[in-house]
Amino acid sequence: MKKHRFTFRPAKVLPVLAALLLLGSAAAAESGFEPFFRFDSGLTAWQEPLKNVRFLTQGAYTLTPLDPGKAEQFGLDPDAVPDTKGMDTLNISGSAEFSDGHFRELAQRLRELADGKEIWIVDCRIEGHALLNGISVSWYGDRNWAYKGMTLAEAEADERERFGALPGTSVTVYEVSDNVRGTSREIQVGTVMFEKELAESEGFHYLRLPCQDHSWPDEVAVDQFIAFMHTVDPDQVWLHFHCHAGKSRTAIFMAITDMMKNPDVSFEDIMLRHAMTGSNYLPYADPESDIADVYAKRAKRIRQVYDYLHEPGAADTVPWSDWIAGMDAQ
């Protein structure tokens, strides 16, 4: 297949809370799963190192061979080594969600690696989240889908109301394991900080892409990201992506960036090198999962977006959402 080099164009309180808790979301009401506040990484994770951090730039990453059992499950050679062309100049990173303390340490490292480049925090979570007293907390529904069906504007409005009502109140926050509510703690909320404010407090820019956990993003989010990439000089920006765990939604947009910046690298090599630096292997869809259809769509779409970006002229003239609608109609 002929490779098409992507063209970048430089750029230029209580009553409210009570009502929100009763309201929940339409998706939650339908499933019978009552949403709640959850610690993003456990009761004490804010005291531990930030999880799933990787920096893809020269001298900052390591390719870790896949576990042989996982490689067999994915249909891969456990000894395979991907092409690393372009990795040294990707200038991207990824991680799980961060507490205030995590973010301050991360910001220092990003500045060192960015070396004067403009830094963007790319938030790949649609679900509501904020820092309560510096600790990352989110609004959790079944499968982490409390905001299922919402637009980004609707999600952000709910997030602002829900979390904005918390200062001066006591709120119960839970741990979650395997979609089950676990240990809880009461928090007397003194401060609430939203992620955009956190990013800007370090002088960084902020971009939010609506993507539901475990899932392929809304097609409009892919449009949004590709349009964003048209407005920046890829050699003069550093992009830090994150979601909740930092393994899948983060991986999607890190991989799309790689595809756009390195059009001569094969799909298979891009997928493998991201899996070997900390991402989930996106082409694999677990057929035994009870959301196998969600994983199957994600696996299909990541390949299709590669094809879209490599179809001569497509990405410069046709939005991804229109292109994929045409493919689905065939």
Give a label for each model feature:
Residues K3-L14:
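Bacterial N-terminal signal peptides that target proteins for export
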